Amino acid sequence: MNHTENTQNQWTKDLALYIQHLVSPDGRDTFESTPLLAEKLYELSSYKEGDTLLDLGCGWGKSLAPFVPHFKELIGVDMSVENLDRAKAIYQAQPNVRFEQGKIQELNLPTQSVDVMITALALHQIPLEEFYGVCQKLHTILKNEGELLMADELILFNPEENIPLFDSVYRYLLANTTPKAVYEQYIKPYLEKGHKYTFEEMKKNTPPEYQFHALIEVETLLATAGFKVKEVVEVTPFFGFLKIVKS
């Protein structure tokens, strides 16, 4: 086994602590947070209790668990009705937890009404051209002293300065995050052996839904919307935890 294979095997082991690959109620492949991921979000938060918490792209609501005893109101938002049905079943005995179906951009919450926002394995699915609008919305409803806690797939290094690492990460993510049938039929046969793929090539040749965002891009958009990244906890070069506050 070569160095690259050893490294990628370690990535898989590290990710398994935080991410579960499951089949959603509507039959889709989905990635859900583990209890350890949820606990890590709570540990990262400056708020150990509060009034209102919002989970963006909540899925089955697993990331909410450690926060439920400590917040007066918790709201989970997701596009999938099937995911929300599962989440509602899990939290049916918790009167302070409710769920809404819809896009993050369409949230109908009062200005500066949320203490903490959390999001796990969701925001990377938003195309960059839509990300600024999402950030504007979040900035409006987050309290001035509030925070956004994020656990997600994100290129945490500068991909243009470390092409060999990006190539390894890119190949790994394509193989492990795209639907298996899509990867085997439309991606794997066209990957060139010995070629070092660059971030620019990824942007040029990969459909938007399969592209990977870099932290340096996201930081720029966050800053434009009035946010700043206060803390980064790296798990792998492409997955970690971010604490984001208003600038």
Regions found by a protein language model. Give the residues of each.
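A short acidic, Gly/Pro-enriched loop at the edge of an enzyme's catalytic core
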Residues: 109-117
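C-terminal alpha-helical "lid/dimerization" subdomain adjacent to the S-adenosyl-L-methionine
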Residues: 151-221
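A short glycine-rich, Lys/Arg-flanked "PGG" loop and its adjoining helix->strand segment in the class I
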Residues: 132-144
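Core SAM-dependent methyltransferase catalytic element
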Residues: 225-247
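Conserved class I S-adenosyl-L-methionine
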Residues: 1-48, 50-57, 62
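A short SAM/SAH-binding and catalytic strip from SAM-dependent methyltransferases
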Residues: 116-129
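Class I SAM-dependent methyltransferase SAM/SAH-binding core
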Residues: 60-106
